[in-house]
């Protein structure tokens, strides 16, 4: 439950924007492993990684000044698909960094990478296909969101593995 509170704070009382931060710059979220994050095997439950990544994405938007802009338009992010590869267990009290970055976008989806590390070692890597909706439920084109956040008109080329993943997950835009 405390992770949900952390996400609510990151979303509704976002941290201050970082001057000069763009939508393509990485954003770092720092936290510690808490007792409530652990499963019966005494390591972080896989669902908790997803909660940490949710907070990381909210902080990414906050860091580039996006939260008030999105709120003014009634736009909000949702996850269309995600995949996480777990590399190392996290245990009670460990310091954790979640580095979130936008890799690129197509007409519908923004693609993000989220890397979870502890002590400089990789614990997990997530790939997320995110989209934005309006309060009425209409889809907001990813390029419109990127433009609102001051990003470039043209998406960087997606890494090959992410482009292949997007096709396999059936989230990639079909021309």
Describe the residue ranges of each PLM region.
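Catalytic strand-loop segment that frames the active site of acyl-thioester-processing enzymes
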Residues: 2-59, 160-175
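Sequence-level motif detector for i,i+2 pairs with an aromatic at +2
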Residues: 24-28, 74, 81
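Membrane-helix exit/interface motif
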Residues: 61-66
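Short structured motifs
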Residues: 80-86
């Amino acid at each position: 439950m405390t992770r949900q509170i952390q996400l609510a704070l990151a979303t509704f009382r976002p941290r201050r924007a970082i001057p000069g931060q763009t939508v393509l710059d990485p954003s770092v979220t720092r936290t510690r492993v808490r007792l409530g994050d652990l499963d019966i095997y005494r390591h972080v439950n896989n669902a908790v990684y997803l909660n940490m990544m949710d907070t990381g994405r909210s902080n990414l938007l906050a860091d580039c000044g996006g939260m008030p802009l999105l709120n003014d338009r009634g736009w909000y992010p949702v996850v269309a698909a995600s995949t996480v590869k777990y590399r190392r267990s996290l245990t009670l009290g460990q310091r954790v960094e979640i580095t979130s970055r936008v890799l690129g976008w197509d007409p519908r989806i923004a693609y993000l990478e989220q890397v979870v590390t502890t002590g400089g070692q990789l614990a997990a890597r997530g790939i997320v296909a995110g989209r934005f909706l309006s309060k009425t439920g209409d889809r907001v084109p990813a390029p419109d969101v990127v433009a609102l956040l001051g990003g470039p008109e043209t998406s960087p080329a997606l890494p090959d593995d992410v482009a292949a993943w997007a096709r396999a997950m059936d989230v990639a835009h079909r021309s």
